[in-house]
Regions:
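Preference for intrinsically disordered or flexible, low-complexity segments
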Residues: 1-246
Length: 246
């Protein structure tokens, strides 16, 4: 079930945060929870892993150390209405310069670590296998749910108002908003960083947890966070995505 503001504020009150409701209202952001789905994969459908759907004859993206690895694709027509500045239509395929074999020297903070293929019209796409590997790639269909998000920690706001007990209650409130480690928008979440990873002028775009079944291991089993310049998102320009992990 989608979580709205009234439900969130009710939960905050139940956790003893009634005196901080104005702060919570001020820092609220829309987010979209990403859930795994057991449906069979279809062409053009949102997914993590598997085989990307691209235009016929598309060239597989590469970087200086070799081929990118397919991360997943998002069909924006499948997302709920409460989606911030995310597009209403189109297909976005994401690739990562991550190499489980350890041969690539790309770092998740490097420019170009994430590569994207944006298709405003996905009606003519078809599955395109990587010419660099004949290994079958596990994949899973996705479904989406609207939620709201609040800051992950004190580093993400200028005026953190909580003592230790209040911080614990606030973290419990945030945990209740996320049915998955994977989500769009909101605030980035991590396991080990002592700073706000959001670059200046950028918005959190995608946060992903590590997943052994998909061979995802970000920063020793932590999280991958992808960011986009706010003006580029409004222009549907995904050519310069940034990343961090921790």
């Amino acid at each position: 079930m989608a979580i709205g503001e009234s439900e969130l504020l009710s939960r905050a009150g139940d956790l003893g945060l009634s005196s901080h409701l104005n702060f919570i209202r001020r820092v609220l952001r829309p987010a979209v929870t990403i859930l795994r789905d057991e449906r069979p994969l279809e062409v053009g459908q949102s997914r993590f892993g598997g085989i990307p759907d691209l235009p016929a004859g598309a060239t597989w993206p590469t970087h200086d150390d070799g081929p990118y690895r397919f991360l997943g694709q998002l069909n924006f027509t499948e997302l709920p209405e409460n989606r911030g500045f995310l597009p209403k239509t189109g297909l976005l395929s994401l690739f990562v310069a991550d190499d489980p074999s350890g041969e690539s020297e790309y770092f998740w903070g490097d420019a170009g670590y994430i590569s994207a293929v944006w298709l405003p019209d996905s009606s003519t796409v078809e599955p395109i296998r990587s010419p660099f590997s004949d290994q079958e790639q596990p994949g899973t269909a996705l479904s989406f749910r609207s939620t709201l998000d609040i800051p992950y920690d004190a580093e993400q706001v200028d005026d953190w108002p909580f003592d230790e007990a209040g911080s614990d209650a606030f973290r419990a409130l945030r945990t209740s908003l996320h049915a998955s480690d994977d989500y769009l928008l909101g605030y980035p979440s991590h396991c080990s960083l002592a700073y706000d990873p959001t670059p200046p002028g950028s918005l959190p775009f995608l946060t992903l947890g590590s997943d052994e079944s998909l061979d995802w291991c970000w920063h020793d089993g932590d999280k991958l966070m992808v960011f986009i310049d706010s003006d580029r998102l409004r222009a549907k320009d995904f050519s310069e995505l940034l990343a961090d992990a921790g």
